[in-house]
A protein has these predicted regions:
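Amphipathic alpha-helical segments used for helix-helix packing
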Residues: 93-113, 160
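Hydrophobic/aromatic-rich alpha-helical bundle segments in the mid-to-C-terminal region
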Residues: 104-108, 134-182, 189
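Alpha-helical DNA-contacting segments of helix-turn-helix folds
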Residues: 56-62, 106, 115-118
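Helix-turn-helix
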Residues: 11, 15, 19-53, 57
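Amphipathic alpha-helical packing segments from all-alpha helical-bundle domains
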Residues: 67, 87, 94, 113-138, ...
Length: 189
């Protein structure tokens, strides 16, 4: 009996991910999700209190992948910014890209939820990360607007890879190319 319950919960989550990705939080209807999951609408409420709780479950873990990447990299005591990323952050960012649909849902489809504005929060957190790195590695001082621009561009680059995702190899190649451009620029400061 427990296997059946887990299977239904997973069907609901899979259906919700598809519907939230195709539409967004505000446009998605529980009836559409139930139809996609091939269950009655009332059954969704057995597993999830409401649509927002269901949305939370769909995007669970995405923010953590991002912050974990930054924290892993910040914990390293040596290496250039690009070396630190390769040692500490790349596996987490890879995980984000493997969950590209959830990343797009969180960033582009979350208006009306507590997750709205997630991109701005990521940009702010990455800006702090870049400022910490610049304090360690930069050869001069720079207007903080530069760090905001760099962080915004990097987050938007990740999102573009997620939005145009073809397959894992393609995503990792795009990430590698983007990082090469990014780190050559940052390491020249």
């Amino acid at each position: 009996m427990q296997v059946l319950k887990e299977e239904i919960r997973n069907r609901i989550l899979t259906a919700a991910e598809k519907i939230f990705y195709e539409q967004d939080f505000r446009s998605a209807k529980l009836t559409d999700i139930a139809e996609e999951a091939d269950i009655p609408v009332a059954l969704i409420y057995t597993y999830f209190k409401n649509k927002e709780v269901l949305f939370d479950a769909v995007v669970a873990g995405v923010n953590e992948h991002f912050t974990d990447a930054l924290e892993q990299e910040e914990a390293l005591k040596s290496g250039s910014p690009s070396q630190r990323f390769e040692k500490g952050g790349v596996e987490y960012v890879h995980g984000l890209l493997q969950n590209h649909v959830k990343l797009v849902i969180l960033m582009d489809k979350s208006a009306g939820t507590k997750h709205a504005g997630a991109k701005d929060r990521w940009v702010e957190r990455l800006q702090l990360h870049i400022e910490k790195g610049a304090a360690r590695f930069a050869h001069g001082s720079y207007d903080p607007a530069l760090f905001h621009i760099l962080s915004n561009n990097y987050v938007e680059g990740l999102l573009e890879i997620a939005r145009h995702y073809k397959n894992d190899d393609w995503a990792m190649e795009m990430l590698s190319l983007m990082n090469r451009c990014y780190y050559h620029g940052v390491e020249s400061l």
